A protein has these predicted regions:
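Conserved N-terminal beta1-alpha1 strand-loop-helix module at the mouth
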Residues: 1-62, 66-68, 83
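Short, hinge-like loop/turn segments at secondary-structure boundaries
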Residues: 53, 76-79, 104-108
Length: 121
């Protein structure tokens, strides 16, 4: 089992951060895993290193890294740049590539309740 998966089973609370202030708070918290939900190609390496330096696992939402494309090569680029423990994405092609690279993956999905929209018509 992937080390991140084992950690999530033991500690199911995950910090999800978008700002530097939230990252600082998450680094000081007992959470062992941090989901990075906002970054740029210029900042993601430093943010992941801060998380790793604190002894925590870093999972990067690759769709929200400004400056990366939505092509499969983006997974390889991100992995070479900052070595995250895993990625989050809504794109199945990126999820498959990340799995083949040994990264833990979280596929984000949006679910719409179509029955609810019919009630309001």
């Amino acid at each position: 089992m992937h080390p991140l998966a084992e950690t999530l089973l033991d500690e199911p609370v995950i910090a999800a951060v978008k700002t530097d202030e939230a990252l600082t708070a998450a680094l000081a918290s007992p959470c062992s895993t941090i989901f990075l939900l906002a970054s740029t190609l210029l900042t993601v390496d430093g943010l992941v290193h801060r998380i790793h330096d604190a002894g925590k696992l870093a999972v990067v939402h690759i769709d929200l890294v400004d400056g990366l494309s939505s092509r499969e090569i983006a997974v390889d680029s991100l992995n070479a740049l900052c070595h995250p423990d895993g990625i989050i994405s809504t794109r199945p092609t990126l999820i498959r590539r990340a799995r083949h690279r040994g990264l833990l993956t979280v596929q984000r999905a949006f679910i719409l309740d179509s029955l609810l929209s019919l009630i309001h018509i």
